[in-house]
From Swiss-Prot:
Localization: Cell membrane
Gene Ontology BP annotations: proton motive force-driven plasma membrane ATP synthesis
InterPro entries recorded: ATP_synth_F1_ATPase_gsu, ATP_synth_F1_gsu
Name the record gives this protein: ATP synthase gamma chain
Gene Ontology CC terms: plasma membrane; proton-transporting ATP synthase complex
Assembly mode: F-type ATPases have 2 components, CF(1) - the catalytic core - and CF(0) - the membrane proton channel. CF(1) has five subunits: alpha(3), beta(3), gamma(1), delta(1), epsilon(1). CF(0) has three main subunits: a, b and c.
Family that this chain belongs to: Belongs to the ATPase gamma chain family.
Membrane topology, record value: Peripheral membrane protein
Primary location group: membrane
Length: 311
């Protein structure tokens, strides 16, 4: 076999081996996606209950429904204060092979920093995932907290420390507001990069929650009640307990959402790699067939020429 044919054949075999790997990785990512979607659906039931009760309590507790930014009785997680420093909790992956997942989240963060005039002097980073931590540390940013090694389906117990730390640093006035930057899962082929304010809890955020609750229906088609609760011993005591839980549910929910998007992005990246491998194999196979045909034609011509010369 000519050297050129042997080289093409080796490339075909190598590409086929790579395709087997990417195809297997796609299947694994898809399985992880299905698993975390089931977990998220279960968690969402709890989160929605917390949101519904909180909206009801705030509306009954605040003198002017959901206009509470200066109502200190609702707690420091609601009260606005002058912004001297901004905290950003950015969620990325620990590894690559996730397509544009990490780069898009980082771009969204940088765009928000530019929009708000944020820099290394007035920004404090908390990072979930090695990629984001390394990116911002290399650029001289203040990374106050790092969390790596998030499992494929993170439990609240696993990420409890980062959730508590994000809230505690705000309460300790290390920063005066907290953004969270992550990739929101839309569907298996689409995601949306978000950089949203988490703390202080905003009126707009609760109004949106209130609207979602109002549009939600129970399994029998009856609207889910969001405002009829009897609270003991007092609204204030319940708010003291519920407001931190609400903030924690927002942060943990974003981590679950980001991990779901990561698995979807990984599955799509591996699917794209497998498709590209198929295209390369087809092209190489065509080259191989043409080269083989040319080699056969050359051999026939040489044999025919030799026989003619003998005559």
């Amino acid at each position: 076999m000519p050297a050129s044919l042997a080289a093409v054949k080796r490339r075909i075999q190598s590409t086929k081996s790579t395709r087997q790997i990417t195809s297997a990785m796609q299947m694994v990512s898809t399985a992880k996606l299905n698993q975390i979607q089931h977990h998220t659906k279960t968690y969402q039931v709890y989160a929605e209950k917390v949101q519904a009760i909180l909206v009801s309590l705030v509306k009954s507790h605040s003198a002017d429904s959901l206009k509470y930014e200066q109502d200190s009785s609702l707690g420091d997680l609601f009260s606005k204060r002058p912004v001297k420093k901004t905290g950003i909790l950015i969620i990325t992956s620990d590894r690559g092979l996730v397509g544009s997942y990490n780069s898009n989240v980082i771009k969204s963060t940088l765009d928000k920093m530019k929009e708000d005039g944020l820099n290394a002097d007035n920004t404090v980073f908390l990072t979930v995932g090695r990629t984001g931590a390394e990116f911002f540390k290399k650029r001289g940013m203040n990374v106050a907290y790092e969390f790596t090694g998030v499992s494929d389906v993170p439990t609240y117990r696993e990420v409890h420390d980062v959730v508590k730390q994000a809230i505690q640093l705000y309460q300790d006035q290390v920063y005066d507001r907290l953004y969270i930057s992550y990739s929101h899962y839309v569907n298996r082929i689409s995601s949306q990069d978000r950089t949203e304010q988490m703390l202080p809890i905003s009126a707009d955020g609760l109004r949106q929650t209130e609207q979602e609750i109002g549009n939600r229906t129970a399994g029998d088609g009856v609207p889910l009640p969001a405002s009829e609760y009897e609270i003991e011993p007092s609204d204030g005591g319940m708010l003291d307990m519920l407001v931190p839980q609400y903030a924690e549910s927002l942060i943990y929910g974003a981590i679950l959402d980001a991990k779901t998007s990561e698995h979807a992005s990984s599955a799509n990246a591996m699917r794209s790699a497998s498709d590209n491998a198929d295209d390369i194999i087809s092209t190489l196979q065509l080259q191989y067939n043409r080269a083989r045909q040319a080699a056969i034609t050359t051999e026939i011509t040489e044999i025919t020429g030799g026989m003619t010369a003998q005559e």
